[in-house]
Amino acid sequence: MTDKLHGKNLRIWIFALLGGIVFAAFDRCGYMIQHYGTLWAISENPLHKTIFHRILIRVPLFTAGVLISFLLLNWLRGRSTDSGAGLPKRGSQGSTAPQTAMAKSLALYSAAQNIPAFIKYWILYFISFLPAFLGGYPGLFAADAPNQIGWTFSGWLTAHHPLLHTGILCGIFSMTRALGWSDNTAAALCNVLQMIILAGIFAWISCFLKKKQAPQWLWIGTVLFFCLFPFHGMMAVYTTKDTVFSGVLVLCLLQVICMCSTPEEYFKGWRHTIFAGITFSLLLLLRNNGFHTMLACVPFLLIYLWKYRKKLLVLALGLVLVYGVYNGPFLNVIGAESGNAREMYNIVIQTLSRTYVAGGDIRPEEMDVIRPVMDEETMALYTPNLSDPVKNQFHTDAFEEEKAEFLKTWFQVGCRNKKIYIDAFLNTTLGFWYPDVEDEYLEFVCFDIQKDDPHYPHVQMEPKSEWLNRYYTAIGTDASFRQIPIVRELLSMGLYFWLLVLASLYLIYQKEYRKLLWILPLWMYLGTSLLGPAALLRYGYPLMAACPILLFTMWKKEA
């Protein structure tokens, strides 16, 4: 380690410096966007005059941080793990303990040993979700769930939200209403089902780490992380598609790791390929960008796994087929309306709107093209961190008629207003990549909208424990943790993006290039999320759920 610190290992210094520049840029750009709304503010202090001066000053600090992280990871890799440490021995007996107590203890231990590890983890994680469930009974009935149910029961079936998730919600509410039960009971059943699914996925992750002989510190840390990290319990009882989607995305990640690390075993027969197809299909059925996430990985997997290209192509074509059938014949059969294409153009919407509001250079002939799609009154609704106010007034039909001309105009305006476009993108995506965002939160509430409409669900929060309710409200709605340094960062989705960046840098430093494929789905998902309407914590939750896998990827030496 001393030799490395004195520069004999030039490679580690190069990558530490590279990482220092990257993280310093994230940190200072985030600070400027958070406090000033723009990167281009000029300071009277010569040390902070421009964004480039600010980044340069922070580079040494972050270079040291990356260097220490790399050295720590190298040390952890070099340690020999004692997988049996801390576990009871079957044959051991305490000479001082009473025989009856010892017999009972051994009997309990023997009974526990006979329970499959997966079931034990599953039960443990389910129990760990109960505090959030009891503190916010019947759960966080918020986000899109009220509209998903209200729209469907009103006769408007739309693929704007995933129909699989909408179908489950509506099925449970239909059943409970038919039985004369309350909407609170229906919401509770939805959340218990979600708790069971997420606990099972967490159990799968824990068993994967044990099977891959992860070090004891990692699998114990994983158990503690899944049980104690408050957002896991809150997301488990949050009736949003993002909860199960996040878990399924991590399962897809595990499939990619297995097919890349042991391809001979993985592609022997069709069992694993079929399971991967089911998992990938669930991903696209739970979120529209799930399809783009996995499809974007296929070319890279084909290059590395060319020997197994036939099965990979079958898998990819199957995914395309499921997506095509779902968005075509299936929607027609059930009479569902397709999702609005404007969801794909959030960056276009935000950049043009900010340019207009900021008084940027938009020429009259360009406004003639823009106005039928977004008029001046619409663009004046611009909100830096959320595209919905403008997007909801975006005229998709007019856009589709002149799509090429509109996008050409957008590009031309951007060429003259580069700084405004950059500011618009960074403001909308800030929460994804900056750990110190002040307004990041996960509301611990129930939404009861359209109170006079019988088609809509009417769910009221009835906490079974007031102190648990106060705790989770402080963590979520009030975001009180934002006042506590370090804790603030640990509970920020931006930190987990930084972990993803650190993992990528470390793998390149170690020349373990093929392992970049292991985390490729996370990068692809993040890429699609950056094009979304906002940086919400539930959108960044997949990175939090995948945290143990990122640590495993960095720890695991390439064979």
Describe each PLM feature range.
Residues 244-264, 280, 297-298, 546-550:
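Specific aromatic-rich, kink-prone transmembrane helix
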Residues 234-245, 286:
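Short acidic/glycine- and proline-prone juxtamembrane loop motifs at membrane-interface regions
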Residues 136-148, 156-172, 176, 180-181, ...:
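Extracytoplasmic catalytic/substrate-binding loops of multi-pass membrane glycan-assembly enzymes
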Residues 192-213:
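Transmembrane-helix motifs of polytopic, lipid-linked glycan transferases
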Residues 335-465:
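Membrane-proximal stem/loop segments at transmembrane-domain junctions that anchor or position
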Residues 1-23, 50-129, 554-559:
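Start-transfer (signal-anchor) and selected internal transmembrane alpha helices
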Residues 272-287, 298-299, 318-323:
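Membrane-interface alpha helices of multi-pass inner-membrane proteins
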Residues 53, 188-189, 427-518, 522:
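Membrane-interface anchor segments at the N-terminal boundary of transmembrane helices
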